Design a protein with these regions (language model features):
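Short, P/G- and charge-enriched loop/turn segments at secondary-structure junctions
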Residues: 1-4, 57-58, 88-91
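Short, solvent-exposed aromatic-acidic interface loops
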Residues: 85-89, 116-123
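Aromatic-glycine hotspot motif
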Residues: 2-22, 72, 94, 105-114, ...
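Hydrophobic pocket/interface hotspot
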Residues: 25, 35, 53-55, 71, ...
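A conserved amphipathic terminal alpha-helix motif
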Residues: 119-156
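A solvent-exposed, acidic/Ser-Thr-rich amphipathic alpha-helical stretch
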Residues: 41-56, 60-62
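Hydrophobic ligand-binding cavity/cleft-lining segments
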Residues: 1-44, 48
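Hydrophobic-ligand binding "helix-grip"
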Residues: 43-46, 64-112
Length: 156
């Protein structure tokens, strides 16, 4: 899995190649049943423009989190993008949303899938850098794209 983090831009980017067609990847990426396999079982996701997204996560030693937002772009089988706001239990939710985008493009032997998380610069002061760095760790620890790859390739 390729990972790049552009600290000056507060941009997180991961990419992986999956041995499957874009349509096969899309089936796992853009369905609740599919997402339950690789992202979370505590998930609400409405797969249409303006649709709601909400995910509950418990991170041992760190706390209980709710991530929520709405679908801003859905272009089968090329892109799924949604806003992302964090609410840690006992704290106020973020005042603004960031953006998470999954993009698919055919490769010679399958599909390149990228995950990009942007918009941290809209958060206030030190919160921007803290959340940016925390989300790099979070996406890596969750092995999000590796989990998607495993789910897609197992279904073939």
């Amino acid at each position: 899995m390729l990972a790049s983090h552009v600290a000056d831009e507060l941009r997180i980017h991961f990419e992986i190649e999956i041995n499957a067609t874009p349509d096969q990847v899309w089936a796992k990426l853009a369905s609740l049943e599919g997402m339950n396999e690789w992202l979370s079982k505590k998930l609400v996701f409405e797969f249409h423009q303006g649709g709601r997204f909400q995910m509950e996560v418990s991170i041992p030693g760190e706390g209980e989190f709710t991530f929520f937002g709405e679908v801003v772009r859905i272009d089968p089988p090329r892109e799924l993008a949604f806003t992302w706001t964090e609410h840690e239990k006992g704290k106020a939710p973020w005042p603004v949303a960031t953006l998470v985008s999954f993009q698919l493009r055919p490769s010679g032997s399958g599909t390149f899938v990228s995950l990009t998380h942007t918009g941290f610069e809209k958060l206030e002061g030190e919160l921007a850098r803290t959340e940016y760095e925390g989300h790099i760790v979070g996406w890596e620890r969750a092995e999000t794209l590796k989990e998607l790859k495993t789910a897609v390739e197992a279904a073939k």
